[in-house]
């Protein structure tokens, strides 16, 4: 911005800085089966000129790519979809200074069947983070084996895993020096968050039965723009979301406002599916643990950090999940072991026999919680089978 002001000042031109990405993006089905996209502009407290004047909406139909976008002046857009077709949407803010970064991609699909039930997919995976920080009295550095972090898209930022963490060896060089690593990762690419992780949830739910499926950002639910009570089933996907303690932003799975919304929802006989690598381990306070036990009937049984344990069995299906960092899809290096609390029961197990998923079939509400990200199921067919089985359980 300093360079912008300097150059424009030399030409006596006013400065306009591109806007921040929009917030509270959500898709809702209207009474006549149209899709209403809504969002809010993001205020830039550090730049008065970064105010959007228009918005670009990009749409992808089915397996096709995104179009060139269409411009609107308001903060909503109504779209008429074809039945049984999955549409993907993303929105950017625009002014004379340029175009903002896009929102996470959200998807929707309207069923051709009359009486189809409404399902909401909540995209709760917003985390961007560096690798796990090691910083105590004697050790310092980054532990890539514990958590490689979450990059935005593809990343080739690693030479090798840090081997030496001894703080007393700061300033030394070579093996044994603080920060020393080898080069086993040099030239390798690793995939991070692609901002479209919820799309497969929408597609798989739509393919599993007569459902009208729409998606929303988690902040739109937290801020009350989306009412969970409008939906027969709610699917919360968290990916690698967690409050890691060292990032500049808190990436909490179940925030206080989200917990309150879910507690209200299940009191009305709601049905909830939750998946993510840290859905239980991210809940450390007594109130947070109480929420897990009351809503999902689970307790934390520990964390499985052995990336060679990638096989899962349950619902009559054997499948594997992505545990090793790779260039195709983000990996769940650590997954949660979640133990059922009566009358809930274990629905899936990891290869070592620990509990991977828990189901609760109550008269008051139903819940299905998975200690790994649904989208990390490695085989598409297996993932679709799992989703269909879970939806059948929740919808009955």
Where are these predicted regions, by residue range?
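Recognizes extended acidic, P/S/T-rich segments that occur
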Residues: 49-85, 96-97, 102
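Aromatic-Pro/Gly-enriched surface loop or interdomain linker
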Residues: 104-232, 237-240, 376, 388-396
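Hydrophobic/tyrosine-rich beta-strand signature of extracellular beta-sandwich/beta-rich modules
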Residues: 87-91
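A recurrent domain-boundary module in secreted/ectodomain proteins
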Residues: 1-19, 372-396
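A glycine-rich, often tryptophan-bearing local segment used as a flexible ligand/cofactor-contacting loop or short
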Residues: 240-349, 386
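Short, surface-exposed beta-strand/loop micro-motifs that present aromatic residues
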Residues: 107, 334-336, 345-366
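Pro/Thr/Ser/Gly-rich low-complexity, intrinsically disordered linker/stalk tracts
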Residues: 2-50, 83, 97-117
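Short alpha-beta junction capping motif
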Residues: 115-125, 132-147, 225-285, 361, ...
């Amino acid at each position: 911005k300093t360079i912008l002001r300097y150059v424009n000042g030399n030409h006596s031109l006013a400065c306009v800085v591109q806007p921040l990405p929009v917030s509270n993006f959500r898709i809702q089905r209207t009474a006549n089966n149209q899709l209403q996209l809504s969002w809010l502009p993001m205020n830039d407290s550090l730049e008065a000129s970064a105010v959007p004047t228009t918005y670009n909406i990009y749409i992808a139909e089915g397996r096709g790519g995104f179009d060139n976008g269409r411009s609107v002046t308001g903060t909503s857009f109504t779209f008429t979809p074809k039945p049984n077709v999955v549409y993907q949407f993303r929105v950017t803010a625009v002014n004379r200074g340029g175009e903002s970064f896009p929102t996470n991609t959200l998807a929707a699909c309207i069923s051709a069947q009359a009486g189809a039930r409404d399902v909401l997919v909540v995209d709760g995976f917003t985390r961007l983070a560096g690798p796990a920080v090691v910083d105590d009295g004697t050790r310092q550095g980054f532990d890539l084996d514990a958590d490689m972090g979450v990059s935005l898209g593809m990343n080739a930022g690693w030479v090798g895993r840090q081997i030496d963490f001894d703080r007393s060896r700061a300033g030394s060089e070579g093996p044994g020096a603080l920060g020393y690593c080898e080069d086993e990762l040099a030239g390798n690419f690793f995939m991070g968050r692609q901002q479209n992780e919820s799309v497969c949830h929408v597609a798989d739910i739509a393919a599993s039965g007569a459902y009208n499926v729409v998606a929303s950002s988690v902040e739109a639910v937290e801020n009350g723009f989306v009412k969970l009570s409008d939906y027969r089933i709610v699917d919360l996907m968290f990916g690698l979301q967690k409050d890691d303690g060292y990032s500049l932003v808190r990436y909490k799975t179940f925030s206080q406002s989200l917990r309150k919304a879910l507690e209200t929802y299940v009191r009305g006989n709601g049905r909830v599916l939750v998946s993510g690598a840290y859905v239980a381990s991210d809940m450390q306070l007594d109130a947070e643990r109480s929420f897990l036990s009351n809503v999902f009937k689970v307790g934390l049984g520990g964390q499985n950090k052995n990336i060679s344990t990638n096989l899962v069995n349950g619902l009559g299906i054997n499948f594997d999940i992505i545990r090793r960092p790779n260039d195709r899809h983000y990996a769940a290096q650590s997954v949660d072991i979640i133990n059922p609390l009566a009358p809930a029961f274990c629905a899936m197990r990891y290869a070592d026999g620990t509990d991977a998923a828990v189901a609760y079939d109550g008269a008051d509400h139903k819940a299905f919680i998975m200690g790994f990200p649904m989208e990390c199921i490695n085989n598409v067919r297996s993932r679709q089978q799992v989703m269909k089985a879970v939806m059948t359980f929740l919808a009955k």
